[in-house]
A protein has these predicted regions:
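Short capping loops/turns at secondary-structure boundaries
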Residues: 111, 115, 131-134, 149-153, ...
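Zn2+-dependent cytidine deaminase-like catalytic core
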Residues: 38-137, 222, 248, 255, ...
Length: 375
């Protein structure tokens, strides 16, 4: 059995690998974020991370960076090494060829092409394998990837900002700004993190947003607009920039001239059936999953947020709370619609974390599974 000192060293090096993995945020999808650190005789001799989809995996980048021969060394990797050919050859092969004698793994890979096979191959070749080091942190790093690979649908995060009395705007509709600059910058990092960003036509008509990532060297998410009847103006900022920023309109409209107008501007138009008078969000998730969109930041208004909850497509809720009070009986709230009839039928949240960001607070919670049989 390993002593406390060795276990602590394992955690320390895995933490380094996690920090490396996070550098790939926003650029690896539909692949996971992965970091790797190679240690020999108590010294780090190589490190790497998966920088971008299609480029070197973390293990191969770490091996390529080694300052001395890795024979007899240990490699710390946040996710089980792959054992199949994709955009890159199997990392298991590279590890075996390198002479590394010990592999320390954070998360097992749920991908059915890997799922325990990489670990088994390593063990069959006499490699010492230690599993589940900082497993919780490594799992959380790739929660969107894990959900997508198991369900073939995007991992959906509902995000909204509100005052302490639960308002997302004043009674006049003014909403700039509910939260402070630090919280708004945090939102930009979320836009980088997730592959897509989704809003409803109501938000587009009210705010004419861009829904882009404003971080330096950031990557714009794929913009997804739920617009049943294609009411978004062709001179809106989203449509006018669709030729340079990937933009999808989900609609049930059969008006071929309207559809052509959007497509001529560079938009992709998805034909999605209606359900209860709105876009069928479950069908939309299937279509987006097939298009390799593995995660979505939902920045909808109250109507779309309600539809998303009612449809059971939301896995996480991010609530930014500003220390302000707007009041107003008619001031909008984050989730509207008809609502649930009683407390027993409410959507339940779990594993809530509270983070202070400047003067504001972020409460991040997971949606508890199977509350309504479809969440």
């Amino acid at each position: 059995m390993k002593d406390i000192t060795d276990m602590e060293k394992d955690r320390q090096y895995m933490k380094m690998a996690l920090e490396l993995a996070q550098k790939g945020m926003g650029f690896t999808a539909p692949n996971p974020m992965v970091g790797a650190v190679i240690v020999k005789s108590g010294k780090v001799i190589g490190q790497g991370y998966h920088r971008k989809y299609g480029e070197l995996h973390a293990e191969r980048e770490a091996l390529a960076s080694c300052t001395e021969q890795p024979e007899g060394a240990s490699i710390y990797v946040t996710l089980e090494p792959c054992c199949h050919y994709g955009k890159q050859p199997p990392c298991v092969n590279a590890i075996l060829e390198s002479g590394i004698r010990r592999v320390i793994i954070g998360s097992s890979d749920p991908n059915p092409l890997v799922s325990g096979k990489g670990i088994r191959i390593l063990k069959e070749h006499g490699i010492e394998v230690t599993e589940n080091v900082l497993k919780e942190e490594c799992d959380k790093l790739n929660e969107a990837f894990f959900y997508y690979i198991q369900n073939q649908k995007p991992y959906v995060v509902m995000k909204y900002a509100m005052t302490m009395d639960g308002k997302i705007a004043t009674y006049t509709g003014a909403s700039r700004w509910v939260t402070g600059e630090a919280a708004r910058m945090h939102v930009q990092k979320q836009r980088l993190k997730y592959t897509g960003i989704m809003a409803g036509v109501g938000t587009v008509l009210a705010d004419d947003p861009m829904l882009t990532c404003r971080l330096e060297n950031g990557r714009n998410p794929v913009r997804i607009i739920c617009d049943s009847h294609l009411r978004t103006p062709l001179n809106s900022r989203i449509v006018k920039t669709a030729s340079t920023i990937p933009t999808i309109f989900a609609t049930s409209s059969k008006d071929q001239q309207k559809i052509k107008n959007y497509e001529d501007m560079g938009c992709k138009v998805l034909d999605v059936p209606e359900k209860n008078g709105h876009i069928d969000l479950n069908r939309l998730m299937e279509l987006l999953g097939a298009a390799k969109i593995d995660s979505i930041l939902l920045e909808g208004g109250g109507t779309l947020n309600w539809s998303a909850l009612e449809s059971g497509i939301v896995q996480k809720v991010q609530t930014y709370i500003a220390p302000k009070l707007f009041g107003g009986e008619s001031a909008k709230t984050p989730i509207e619609g008809k609502g649930f009839p009683d407390p027993a039928s409410a959507v339940l949240l779990k594993n809530s974390e509270i983070i202070r960001i400047g003067d504001d607070f972020l409460i991040e919670s997971e949606v508890k599974s199977n509350v309504h049989g479809n969440c």
